[in-house]
Every structure is written in C-alpha cells, then in structure tokens.
Design a protein with these regions (language model features):
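Extracellular/periplasm-exposed beta-strand and loop segments of Gram-negative cell-envelope proteins
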Residues: 1-8, 42-75, 106-136
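Residues that define the transmembrane beta-barrel architecture of outer-membrane proteins
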Residues: 6-14, 27-29, 74-80, 129-135, ...
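Transmembrane beta-strands of outer-membrane beta-barrel pores
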Residues: 18-20, 35-43, 101-109, 143, ...
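Short loop/turn motifs that connect adjacent beta-strands in outer-membrane beta-barrel proteins
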Residues: 21-30, 89-95
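Early exported N-terminus immediately downstream of N-terminal targeting peptides
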Residues: 24-52
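Membrane-embedded beta-strand positions of outer-membrane beta-barrel proteins
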Residues: 31-35, 80-82, 97-101, 137-139, ...
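Detector for outer-membrane/organellar transmembrane beta-barrel domains
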Residues: 69-106
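Predominantly the C-terminal beta-signal and adjacent terminal strand-loop region
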Residues: 123-175
Length: 175
C-alpha cells in the first residue's frame, strides 16, 4: 500500500518551448511538441514516511513516536510530449484537444516530512526511475485547458521500491 493522500498532492509547471507542425491546409490538424518543467509533490497519509534502507530498498515506515503533520515525495521533471492536436475556431478563440505519448526526465527527488514546524529530509534517493513514459493530453478553449497525464512506466524502480504509476489531472492557462 502506498498510503497516498491524493487530495493533498499537487504539481506546478511552466512551458519552456513549443513547436507545431500543421498536417492539413486548413490548419485544424497537427503535431505539437512541448518542453515543460514540472515540480511534483506526492503527499502520504498519516504517519507514513517514504524511506530507503541500508540495502537500498525503498518502502514505507510508520513514525510511531511523533505525530507527522505532513509527509511527501517531491521531484522535478522535464516533460516532453509529442501530441496529435485538433483545433476548431469558434469566434475569436479556438477549441482544441490533443493526445499522445510523452517522455519525462526525473531528478532531484526528496522524501520529506514535518513534525510540528520542523522539516526533516528522510532520503534523497527513493529509487526514482530517471526516465518515464506517459500517455497525456489536453482539451481547452482560448487560454484555458484541462490536462491529464498517466504513466505507462513505474515512477520508482520496481525491483527496489513499491510499484506505482502516477496520474495527473489539472488546469492549465496561457499568459
């Protein structure tokens, strides 16, 4: 059991670059390639803390001597999706949707927790897989969108850690 607290987990990101290729004369169908930098925080329930022991095996331990206020895994990723996009102009804005595969490069992971106001880093090595593959997409209108991303490869090295496949759903907007 991963003891995930999904309602408290979150991520934020910024689009670094985008490149689009139209596949038809009316510019309604195309391929879009993006580069996004994303910071992710996966929170855990109760007194559970993600840790790596001296045999380099990652798992959960329960803190029984203190009340853990917050426990989470955080990491950065560079996400590079290649998506097939369809768009349709309505008034002055476009209705658009896209779906396709994505690759992410993950690094700088930390398992941290709080007891009262004191923050502790449990480990900086949770056997994070450095490369991940996803199915992802979005749909939107104008400057607002709803996005989703679902891993098809595990977040952690399954030989040394619990098997988990992250899923993200969120809102995006253009500045």
């Amino acid at each position: 059991d991963l003891h995930v607290k999904s309602s408290k987990s979150w991520e934020w990101g910024i689009g670094l670059a985008s490149c689009d290729f139209s596949l038809n004369a009316s510019n309604t169908l195309g391929v879009t390639i993006n580069a996004q930098l994303i910071n992710i925080h996966n929170h855990f329930q109760g007194n559970w803390i993600l840790t790596t022991d001296n045999t380099n095996t990652t798992g959960f331990r329960e803190e029984t001597n203190n009340n853990v206020r917050k426990s989470y895994l955080s990491y950065w990723e560079l996400n590079i999706p290649v998506l097939m996009e369809y768009q349709y102009k309505i008034g002055h804005n476009k209705l658009y949707m896209a779906i396709g595969p994505g690759m992410e490069i993950r690094k700088s992971e930390h398992s941290r927790y709080f007891i009262e106001d004191d923050k502790y880093t449990e480990t900086s090595d949770v056997n994070l897989n450095p490369i991940g593959l996803n199915i992802q997409g979005y749909c939107g209108y104008g400057d607002m969108m709803i996005y989703f991303r679902s891993a098809i490869t595990p977040l952690l090295n399954s030989n040394k850690a619990p098997k988990c496949f992250p899923v993200s759903i969120g809102l995006g907007f253009s500045l």
